[in-house]
Amino acid sequence: MTNPFFEPWTAPFEAPPFDKIKPDHFAPAYDRALKEHLAEIHAIANDPAAPTFENTIVALEDTGRLLNKVESVFHNLASSHTNEHIEAIELHMAPVMAKHWTGIHMNGPLFARIDSLKQNEGKLGLDAESLRVLDRYWLDFVRAGAKVQGAGKERLAHIVERLATLGTEFGQNVLADEQAYVLPLAEADLAGVPDFAKEAAAETAKDRKLDAPFAVTTSRSSVEPILAFADNRDLREKLFKAWTARGDNPNDHNNAALIQEMVRLRAERAKLLGYKTFAHFKLADKMAKSPEAARKLLEDVWAPARRRALEERDALQKVVTGTGGNFKLEAWDWRYYAEKLRKERYDLDESEVMPYFQLEKMIEAAFDTAHRLFGLDFAERKDVPVYHPDVRVWEVSRKGRHVGLFYGDYFARSSKRGGAWMSSF
């Protein structure tokens, strides 16, 4: 069996050949890529020449080309169009990749070269960008355990591997609950729901091969229109609770035990690295620098934010009472009555605004903004392989010169994790 990862990519612009890549290709591709990467790392770590920015940092930047290619394609598929084969590979590879990178970060000779450069950075004559790269490499190695000694190093490596597995299981559990949940609905259930949301619900029922004319899932794009527009309060409550319970249901996908173990291991990892808590470790290289600084910001914001939230709650409760409701405002009521209040105060109905935000118009607006700000032009390409029929590809250019490809994947589906996010190849 030929493996696309071992052959030149002949699609336009050497784009990933998604039409040829199969799940069975990843295991041998990972195996070869990891071996090649370790050989490259070994050569740098054991270079007899004194460490320089070029033979250490620049050399590291140039390693792992095949691994980067395999990883970028795989993780895009795992997030965008997964299946049981991809999930099995993801779960298997999570600790393997954690062990691989931990081994690199704890490579004594390699870190000694990086540390030597860091200690002498003022004598290297580097520009600001190169100094930043050196600093980031050094910090990443230290935060990954390069300075941990003795038994602590072995324990830290084990923790990192285990956390990788737990994190993967956590995400897969949430997606599994999202894939499993579907709520069939009749026309009467959708009173108040605008046509655009009804059309999406009808498409969901068709995709799930249901007898019911409509259906909703716990994907955000399915939930939010129901919470904002459905007159049926019982439906809003049922869907809201299902949405917020993903990964917390009494089934095989419950994340409670995973969370407890993750919290314990994160705390232990932080202490092995010399930090008081995981929060101190996590924030040390962020703008806040410490949990104390982050907490101060939250406390400064808390009082006015809470005051405003209570004002909004009281205003919404008045709408509930004024429209004949004899109940206390709950979480599944908030969007619905906020929509009514918006219409009452500003004569603004979101369902009437939605047609002005059609996908094609939003794509056109985004591309126009990119052109005005950065001089970028976008031309759709139909000859570039994609991983799902929903995906569209545009060639990006500036003043006639090729810049890259932009893949747009705009629709929710059961094989795709929720949210707004991006990846790169």
What role is predicted for each listed range?
Residues 129, 133, 162-165, 172, ...:
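Active-site-proximal, well-structured secondary-structure segments within enzyme catalytic domains
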Residues 10-25, 74-93, 115-158, 215-257, ...:
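Short His/Asp/Glu-rich catalytic/ion-coordination signatures at enzyme active sites or charged loops
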